[in-house]
């Protein structure tokens, strides 16, 4: 009998300590108190650029295996539409396959 009373009392103490009251102040990063404004930017959904043109996203480049890739010209980063990934024919074929998969998951219309 005493053991059951001790277990019940311990459970009640744990419940009181574990659940804070409604009057307590919100924590600094509390998800219920913090509000965020999300800005949705319009992005290109259809292709408008050919191989060699400057781009920002894969959706801008026309072609199933064409992606917006990064090259370095004179130490400066330049993004342009490209489909060639290597001078080796086998590696280039594998690269085009990877580009095709990347474009498939870009969800361009």
Curated annotation (Swiss-Prot):
Principal localisation: secreted
Proregion positions: 19-46
Signal peptide: 1-18
GO molecular function: ion channel regulator activity; toxin activity
Tissue/organ expression: Expressed by the venom gland.
Cystine pairings recorded for this chain: 47-62, 55-68, 59-108, 61-81
Compartments in which it is found: Secreted
GO cellular component labels: extracellular region
Keyword hit for Disulfide bond: yes
UniProt keywords, alphabetically: Disulfide bond, Ion channel impairing toxin, Knottin, Secreted, Signal, Toxin
Domain notes: The presence of a 'disulfide through disulfide knot' structurally defines this protein as a knottin.
UniProt similarity note: Belongs to the neurotoxin 25 family. F7 subfamily.
Its job: Putative ion channel inhibitor.
Protein name: Hainantoxin-XVIII
Lineage of the organism: Eukaryota, Metazoa, Ecdysozoa, Arthropoda, Chelicerata
